[in-house]
Each structure stands twice: as C-alpha cells, then as structure tokens.
Design a protein with these regions (language model features):
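A hydrophobic/aromatic-rich effector-binding and dimerization subdomain
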Residues: 1-18, 73-138
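Generic protein-terminus/edge-of-domain signal
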Residues: 1-61, 68, 100-104, 111-115
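A conserved hydrophobic position in a structured secondary element of the catalytic/binding core
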Residues: 64-65, 87
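A general structural signal marking secondary-structure boundaries and capping sites
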Residues: 66, 138-141
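Short, solvent-exposed positions on alpha-helices
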Residues: 125, 143-151
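Conserved small/polar residues in nucleotide/adenosyl-binding loops
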Residues: 153-155
Length: 155
C-alpha cells in the first residue's frame, strides 16, 4: 500500500482488547490486513479513515475495512477508552451464507464512505453486553472457554 505502513498482526480468527490509556504519541496513517472494529467509550478523539474525519462521541462504533488507510488523533490530556476487535477475513468468510454475510457492515461502510455508526444507547444494548462478555471470556480459564467464545459470536 504505497507509502503506508502495515501495523498489527493477527494470528487467530479474532482478537479483542479493552484499553484505557493516555496517548501522547501521534499515530501515522497505516493499514491492517484484517478488519477492525473500535467501540469508542471515552476521551477526545478524531478518527481518520480513507480521507474522512470523524470526531467521535461516546459509544460510536468505527468500522475499518481491511487495507483501509486510517489513523487516530487523541487528545493526550484525557484518558482514551475503547474496545478494539480484530477480525480475520477468513473468519468472516467462514460464516458467510445465503442468509447473512458478516462482511456486509464493512462493505456498506466502504460503499457509503461512512465508517462510524452512532448508537446513542449502545451501552444499554445487547450488542454491548455481548461484547463485554466476549471480552471477559478471553481472560477466563474455564473449561471449554474457546467454545463459549464461539457461542457468543453466534448470538
């Protein structure tokens, strides 16, 4: 991808992180070979995706398609809290059927040049609750934890 660096690697079907930090580093434009979803929780952040700028509001969902050029600009005086999900293209392809296609949200975001979903009541939604359960499942050492994670994805 001419002049842009590839950042991050994904060695599994998906990965989820819940991060809160104060970032003083300026991020350069970059891309990933996997899809990325960021659920913005708090801070003062602008997200840049494929030439568009999005000032984020709490609980915005940022959809970054694989190979999209993007970066984040963070106000270093405030904590930046977010949940990040990396999803491999192979994982999405494995769950594509005639009835549904998990890549639809990424394709629609790209087609409509609108990478942010603004859901004002997200923190009360079942999607947010499942995301939190999925996040916690990665730290669980319970029997069949990976099966539990897959069942959460199927919900």
């Amino acid at each position: 991808m001419g002049g842009y660096n590839k950042r991050g690697y994904l060695n599994s079907d998906f990965k989820i992180f819940h991060l809160t930090d104060q970032i003083s580093t300026e991020f350069k434009f970059h891309y990933h070979e996997f899809h990325k979803i960021t659920i913005f929780i708090s801070g003062n952040v602008q997200y840049f995706v494929e030439g568009k700028t999005y000032p984020l509001e709490p609980y915005d969902i940022v959809l970054v398609n694989r190979n999209d050029i993007h970066r984040v600009q963070v106000d270093p005086s405030l904590p930046y809290e977010r949940i990040i999900v990396y999803i491999s293209p192979g994982f999405i392809d494995a769950y594509r059927t005639d009835d549904y296609d998990l890549s639809y949200c990424f394709e629609k975001a790209k087609k409509e040049h609108s990478n942010v979903l603004r859901i004002h009541s997200l923190e009360k939604s079942s999607l947010f609750k499942i995301t939190n359960r999925l996040e916690r499942s990665f730290s669980d050492t319970e029997y069949a934890g990976s099966l539990y994670r897959l069942s959460l994805i199927h919900i």
